[in-house]
């Protein structure tokens, strides 16, 4: 087993559990990522706080380097269960790795990533997933760290994206039934919709009821469901701003759960979802193409290829089952 590196010994610099100071970490992420070639999303304090409300999330899995009371480097791992090669694995998805501009090139990012690996292994996790935008230096850094720690790692999927601009219009929505009934119906619809995806997709996220409930109510959540007789489906996503001068409001599509809907009904569901996003102020929509869902409704809705490409790296701490490339995946990217 690879031991996590010891915390830094300087009295002014040490690795600690994240303290929950979301305002400062939000500023750290934005300033650190501002140098990236592609404009990042604006990870607000409220969005970050909602990520840690996910069942099982812990400040322990968010090692942070503080100088006094100020965070200068940060990373977080969020728990997920995935079914891969017939086994349910508990993994973490590593995200938000950031180092303050004045502290870069000192090895803090590698130090924190290694620390997160050690903490995840000590907590009994089976592996981890890292995402890197195509062309960014992090691709080489992640693979280099995995080789250094002798971790079985493979690029399991490279995710292209599709997007479309959204035209502001008045969208009429009719809601029948009480709010509590709609929420319960959405939860059952969601869990029913993911079941065949988990069975048919080589690497797929497995949801508990509590996790699915979080997904439907997460910060900025947009959800639409549609039924036609006994057929039904649901689409989920959330609203974020892009960290550009215009603060473009972007609707990120997460779960395309067409369920048992027929082709025209899937298009209806997608239009309902986009209308809800427009009503919430969305100016564009973007969706990762993971090949677990029918893409015909996206083509009908005039989605087009985006230049964005994100590589996913799967690490299995024990080496079994061996991580390898898959033709389709169902797992969130952030």
Locations of regions flagged by a protein language model:
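Amide-forming acyltransferase catalytic core, primarily the GNAT-like/NAT-type
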Residues: 2-69, 76, 81, 143-255
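Active-site/acyl-donor-binding loops of N-acyltransferases
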Residues: 2-7, 128-177, 234-334
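An acidic- and aromatic-residue-enriched active-site/binding cleft used to recognize and process polar
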Residues: 46, 76-82, 94-99, 132-136, ...
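Short, high-confidence coil segments that cap the C-terminus of an alpha-helix
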Residues: 60, 122-125, 221, 279-282
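Beta-sheet entry/capping signal
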Residues: 61-62, 69, 74, 91, ...
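Alpha-helix boundary/capping segments in eukaryotic regulatory proteins
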Residues: 83-89, 104-105
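Conserved acetyl-CoA-binding loop-helix of GNAT-fold acetyltransferases
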Residues: 94, 99, 105-118, 263-275
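Membrane-interface helix-loop-helix junctions at boundaries between adjacent transmembrane segments
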Residues: 102-134, 138-143
